């Protein structure tokens, strides 16, 4: 494969190139560098008055009721939703292929009023790619980076008459364990000294740090 040039050039040969998307490379047929790069990562937090169900309903252009608070979010009139898809790890419950079931499971599992419910990636897509290539690009990126780690992915591709294709990728904050149940977001590990021994703090407790699992 040939890497994509860092800057636009006048001529391109017909070949397979590597397209850089959100820090990863994917082979796509005859790609031209994207005109305007955009990629934003954010957290859907209940503490900020947001909900995963509302976000999923808006991104997909659907009507979904949040079982956590009883609110119904209807975005069926939203324009520009050209593709939606849910990607699940092999051990996920089959019912999670339904958008309402997936995100209501997340909402009901998280009890805290300030819970972090989902992670979202908003990224521009190259207009030079066909719709099928745009979908494949996002699907392969999500499968390799997130589904392989046990996370559930709900992505949507939006486009309007102005020609601004972009994707919204929603990720579960928790991975699924081998039984298909929600697992911990992070795990605790002990800090070790140069001899491999646990470091004890003045309080008598051992020094630890958290490792994010997603």
Question: Residues of each region from the PLM?
Answer:
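Charged/polar low-complexity intrinsically disordered segments
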Residues: 4-9
